[in-house]
Structures are given as structure tokens and as C-alpha cells.
Amino acid sequence: MTGAIVVAETGTGRLIYASRPLASWTPPRLFAALAEVGPACLLDSAQVHPRTGRYSILVSNPTAILSGKGQDLTWRYPHDGVERPVVGNPFRLLRDHLRRRRATAVPGLPPFQCGVVGLLGYELVRQLERLPATTVDDAGVPDLFLLSCDRCVVVDHLAGRVWAMARPAPLRQEAGGDGEARAWVAAVMERLAAGPRPTVERPFYITAPVTPHWNRTTYLTVVARVQRYIQAGDVFQVNLAQRFTAPVADGDDPWGLYLRLRAINPAPFAGFLRGDDFAVVSSSPERLVRVQGRVVESRPIAGTFRRPASAADLAATAAALRADPKERAEHLMLVDLIRNDLGRVCLYGTIAVDELLATEVYSHVVHLVSNVRGRLHPKQDVVDCLRACFPGGTITGVPKVRCMEILDELEPFYRGPYTGGLAYFSDTGAMDVNILIRSITVRAGRAFLHAGGGIVADSHPEREYHETLHKAAALVEALGEVSAATPGVVAVRNACHYD
């Protein structure tokens, strides 16, 4: 029954939930209406698709937050005002917390039924591999920022429904009381029934043009160094990224930036994370790994052509991308890497490529995409699966560890959130993690964005340089016009300065 509150036993407690038709609500409207003050996250299927973009998830008002750098971490409990420093491997701490939260799945509900949502930064790889510490961390964003939430709102886009779910606090469950959780679900249903209200978003401006760290000449020089490593036999392919920055107007709200990026470049693994003093804005097209039941899936993207200006040329461009020998070879090499990663945690003989060399179209580019799946080994869990796949081979290269050593040498700055992931870990054991490409991080008055591409032996450096600019184009367009307070620069498409 629409809006009726249901109480379900889940083994270790109860889940209280209700649902109603989605109607005219969208994930951004839900976030604007329901997200509470403070840290919050929206995982947004801005491009709906049965396989990749079915669910959107909103969490705020977390019961606990795990954040920090390296192994110097902190558990914070906002409801109690308590902070507890901890020293340890973040993957182990995450596993321990997920085990404490574990609950039986309620049939018929979306896979996320409360749990942990948030950021896994690229630098977490230093907890998995010994890498040289030569890059500079000038952005200061945590390596991880995870919200543990007993309340969530989930959209099932294919079913056209929105769900509110809540777990009573453990002590209240023991006493048989779940009034607060029930009241919250009822309040959400009442707010949804009233429908969206007009909102006025705060502006978001940059105050000077976006500038790449490397000019064209430097980028071509670095590509040549990568190709020398390839010729020496160190690696087969390296995914080299360059960073762009822009100053941000004081007090501007990154939520406005997210809305612009979503409109320009809708993507199935989009997301917005509001941290303590930073924000991550993403329109990612790529899934790192998903676990649902015992089925594991990864969806690598490798191979990019610029989207043609004319829709009439789109089919020809996609066909040319699929037929391009270099793009095909690079893609198949990375599919093999993903098969190997999944093979570390999946049952022998279950790894299969069930979609190969498909094309996906986005606002500025066309991508080659495949889908790899397997069955998780009974002795492995979602954290084992994450460790096996993280970070994605499509954004490091082949072989992965040597590529990361080379990237640490050649890229001058921490990647931070870029090429890490936004993730959910459901109390039911489900997990889904994107790869944070097409993303912007905002902190301390600056916006940081990256764009990269795979370098192989026969890469044309000039073409690779322009590919990074094409990939950055949607992000630069979303950053938009320079503030009117800065005279002389007004056009969106002139908001990036290239040397």
C-alpha cells in the first residue's frame, strides 16, 4: 500500500520503511528537500539504464563518520558529539564496521537498505601497495570520508518509486521502541506527498579561468617519458592524468555546480558528496565494481573518441571507435586486467565477459565499454572484492602496480578523490562503487579537476593531449562563467586557459 509504514525483522534488528510513486520528484529535488545540514551524499543515476542506472541514494544526518588520511583516522559520532581517533588500516576498519551493521535483506526492496556511503580516495592505494611518496597533497581532502547511516531515501527509477528506510538505534530496538525511526519515515512520506517546491539555488562561480598544471609542451614531454618506460618493457599502458584548477568565489555552494554538471553531462554513476570543508561533484560514466547477492560485476571504460557535432555522424563515430585497432587493443588488454582482478575473489570458472566493445555516448565523448562478471567466492566479502579491484585498472594502466609507481613519479600532485570512488555498502552485503572520473573537488577556495588518457607505445602525443581537453570540456563548461566581479572573461567556452 502506498505510503503505509512496514516493520521488517532483519535478523539483527528491524528495518522500518515505506514507499510511494516517484511522480515529479528527481534525485536533485529530493536532495534539496530532504538532505539535512552537514555531511550528506547523493548517488545519482542521472542517466537511467536497467543495468547501470536504476537506483539513486540519498543519505544525510549520519550516526557515525569515518575519515582521515593514511592510517590516522577518526570515528566521529555527530549525535553524541564524540570523536574517537583510531590508527589502523582503513579497509580493516571498514570491514569491522560493516560486520557490526550486517542485516538480512528485506525482499522486494532496493539493494541499499541503510549502511555506509561516501568517498574512497585514490590515495587509499597506499594502504594496499608500497608506492614512492613523491606527489604533493596541496588539496588536503581526506583519503576516505564514509557516512554510516541508519536512514536513507532510495529511488528505483525503473519502478518509478521512492523509498524511505530507517533502522532504530540498537538500544531502542532492544527496548522495543522504534518511534523516532517510524516518525522519520512518516515525515518523509508526508513531504513527498506534498510534491517538490520551487527552489532557488545559490550561485557557483570561478573567479579566474581554469588553468592546467601542464602546458601543451610539458604534457607532450611527460607522454614521451611514459613511452620510454613502455619501450623499456616496464609497462604496456599508463593512464596519465593532468590536473586543472580554478579559484572559486567565496561562499559559493558546490551544489549549484553539481546541478550544472548534471544538466550538461548526465551519467549513470553521478554523485555529490558534501564533506566537512570540501565537496566532490561527479558525472562519472564508469562502475568500478558491484556486488549483489554473490554476483560481482565490473564495467571498464577504455577507448574514447570526441563526440561529433552532428547527430547524423554519431553512428559512424561509434563504428569507427569499435573498429580502431589501437582503441580495441587497449580496451581488450584492460578487460583482461579486470578479469584477473575479479579472478582473485571469484569462484574459478565463473568469470565471463557478457558485454564486449559496446559504445556509450556522453555529452562530449563516445566511449568503448565492456562488462565483466563472476561469482564471489564463499570465503570472500565485499571488502576483499574492493581491495582486489581498487583502484581501477582503466585509470592506472597495465600492469597496475608498476603503472602506479610511474604515475607517482610523473604526476606532481595527489589525485585525491579523482580515480578513487563514491561508494555504497549496504547492511545487506550489497556494494556498488564508481570510478571518480569527470569529477571536480572543491575545497579552500579552489576547484580541482583532472582528465587523463591511456598512453601506449604507438600513442600520438598530440592526440592524447587533445583527448584530455575533450574529457575536461564538460567539467570546464559546468564551472561556467567567471564571476561578473572579474571583468573581461564571460563566455563559458572561454573559461579554460590553455598554453
Residue positions per predicted region:
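Extended alpha-helical targeting/anchoring segments
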Residues: 1-499
